[in-house]
Amino acid sequence: MSKLDLTKYGILNATEIIHNPSYEFLFEEETKAGLEGFEKGQLTELGAVNVMTGVYTGRSPKDKFFVMDDTTKNTIWWTSDEYKNDNKPVTPEAWKSIKKLAVEQLSGKRLFVVDTFCGANESSRLKIRFIMEVAWQAHFVKNMFIRPTEEELANYGEPDFVVMTASKAKVENYKELGLNSETAVVFNLTEKVQVILNTWYGGEMKKGMFSYMNYLLPLRGMASMHCSANTSMDEKETAIFFGLSGTGKTTLSTDPKRKLIGDDEHGWDKDGIFNFEGGCYAKVINLSRENEPDIYNAIRRNALLENVTVDAAGKIDFGDKSVTENTRVSYPIYHIENIVKPVSKAGHAKKVIFLSADAFGVLPPVSILTPEQTKYYFLSGFTAKLAGTERGITEPTPTFSACFGAAFLSLHPTKYAEELVKKMEMVGATAYLVNTGWNGTGKRISIKDTRGIIDAILDGSIDKAPTKAIPFFDFKVPTALPGVDPNILDPRDTYADAAEWTKKAKDLAERFIKNFVKFTGNDAGKALVAAGPKL
């Protein structure tokens, strides 16, 4: 048993502490006989274990709170009537009760403690310690965060932040504590502790630390970004891909011709781009070996599937969305062959790609943005929310999520835009808006065409292509690109009647204009209005 002292966190009488367990140990633990309910893992035909997370098959943004105190009162971007977001305040008194529930749940139990890093750059990384009573949750964070070397573990010392996952505890008196439900995902930035109660969804542990990095880094002059990143084989040409869940961040950055830096969360400092994580969390709905070979091949021993349909013999049905559309797999990043080693970081990004899945069928498959349009569309963060990545959303509906990640922004969105643009200007980067959604055919733009577009951006051929302007949005779009169907580049050409596009375009333009009003409270925001759509 580990000599680790958990009493300093209030956790008493642990019957056993399994500190930094190996993958082999975790595999035995999560598949052993006698486990019940959501603790139980099932071995699948691909060698990966599958777990179910119950009613929470996505994050629960309505249950996310920060303790409002002297540390956070003037720094956090709090939700308001004018601009609602997920950063809801809870009192220091309520925090005591919430933390007590977690501590009581974890006391007297056999516990797993996993020490990790968040951030690939030694100068800015954080030491994050996770404490939980469920083996597969320990496996999840071992996959998703950066695994310290033996030597780094020996000198780990005290963590910078502690996460207590107590999925079996629920907040019965949530109303009097000012919470939303029996489930709580609460951060205390003064104590540097996060508590997770009554949800089993793995993504809460991952995204919690993203919210924390999003708090710290911009205050230290770094860009903190909800994006994937890759670089050329010689590691000289880096690109970053912003986009909300389901727009293609993981799929498009996992490219056999390039090296992956990471698939979801990155920082950008004076030296370049660095990953926060040590793993990937890919959506696997309708996954096939043909369409996404790299992700498919990453699903093997030590990968962890979530909410996938598996029969008694271990056979997987990736097409079944009866539990959720948000089926996932987490795997350590080295399950992908082409990665940047030994540290997930590379130089500055010259290509910045905004991915948007437009359910309206209005946006061109690719537009070359001006610097002002870059700020405008980054702050707008448009996509159509795709089915099932959060509870209660199943149809495509338009979403404007600032910086392509409003759910994880702890500071005001303009702070992130400012840091990103500063870095882009420093290296002369260009931004491109890529629509991975639908067009006038009623079908989604093919992954083959989208990959062709990405290739043209990365190899620079888009910058030499002839272009034209698209009305209302004044987007500069190429009229021909190698390997891309020329008939889709102007979205109007995909409609039997171009008037149909015009009608939809006016509607979408109006939505952009209306959404952007919330950024016009200061001169910088007002100045950007001209870069947006005009009716």
UniProtKB/Swiss-Prot annotation:
Origin superkingdom: Bacteria
Listed cofactors: Mn(2+)
Free-text remark on how the cofactor is bound: Binds 1 Mn(2+) ion per subunit.
Chain residues that bind Mn(2+): K207, H226, D264
Any one biological process term the GO annotation gives: gluconeogenesis
EC number, as in UniProt: 4.1.1.49
Keywords of this entry: ATP-binding, Cytoplasm, Decarboxylase, Gluconeogenesis, Lyase, Manganese, Metal-binding, Nucleotide-binding
Major location category of this protein: cytoplasm
PROSITE patterns found in the cross-reference section: PEPCK_ATP
Catalytic activity: oxaloacetate + ATP = phosphoenolpyruvate + ADP + CO2
GO molecular function, one term: metal ion binding
Gene3D superfamilies, per database record: 3.90.228.20, Phosphoenolpyruvate Carboxykinase, domain 1, Phosphoenolpyruvate Carboxykinase, domain 2
UniProt cross-references to InterPro entries, sorted A to Z: PEP_carboxykinase_ATP, PEP_carboxykinase_C, PEP_carboxykinase_N, PEPCK_ATP_CS
UniProt-annotated location(s): Cytoplasm
Family in the record: Belongs to the phosphoenolpyruvate carboxykinase (ATP) family.
Function: Involved in the gluconeogenesis. Catalyzes the conversion of oxaloacetate (OAA) to phosphoenolpyruvate (PEP) through direct phosphoryl transfer between the nucleoside triphosphate and OAA.
The protein, known as: Phosphoenolpyruvate carboxykinase (ATP)
Lineage: Bacteria, Pseudomonadati, Bacteroidota, Bacteroidia, Bacteroidales
